[in-house]
């Protein structure tokens, strides 16, 4: 089918209703450019995670179109679409009875890569996230710190060479020092890899640090979308609240 968009991801007039009388998202219009990190900023219940689920076709829009890699999400085979996407979430989701190596190798094996390619890729991504295979490949998740588990989760998300990364507050459960360290590592990694990333957060500082652009959601609507410097100067009332919180040293609005 002919591509209908040159953008990596595009939302065109998208609405999503969880039930006839409950609108979760309304009239979303935005694009995610190739190689961009777009931060979805908002409180709990603002619709951020629903956006991710619309991208990977776990949900279908009630109206409008979600386009991924030039095709409407409904035109994608769901399995093929999801195999193009890497996922990193707050709870990591590592299999406790699998070693680090086995956790990272899981998706490439499901993709039926040959054994040598799997082994080489696991070693490569573990090095990328700062966990050399010689030291960490044989460990189990309960033998790792919280920061190390998040690094393994990121390595697993990258292992099958996805076109896109969907990240749902992946660093939210970490202590502030570890979180800042991993944010810095992720930013350097993204500068090198240039994946297309949609990253959910409720932390305005994280959005300003990691994002090429910030999309602010409030009650299912897009309030503003802009680069960090412009976001700090936004005239939008909700954006101004987030900027005020940031400048007073807090992390986020009440959830």
Each language-model region and where it sits:
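Conserved catalytic motifs of ABC-family nucleotide-binding domains
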Residues: 161
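Catalytic Walker B motif of ABC-type/P-loop ATPase nucleotide-binding domains
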Residues: 165-168
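Short helical segment in ABC ATPase nucleotide-binding domains corresponding to the A-loop/adjacent helical element
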Residues: 101-110, 119, 123
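Conserved ABC ATPase "signature" C-loop
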Residues: 219-220
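Conserved ABC ATPase signature
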Residues: 139-144, 148
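Conserved ABC ATPase "signature" region
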Residues: 116-135, 188
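Helix-to-loop junction immediately C-terminal to a conserved catalytic motif
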Residues: 56
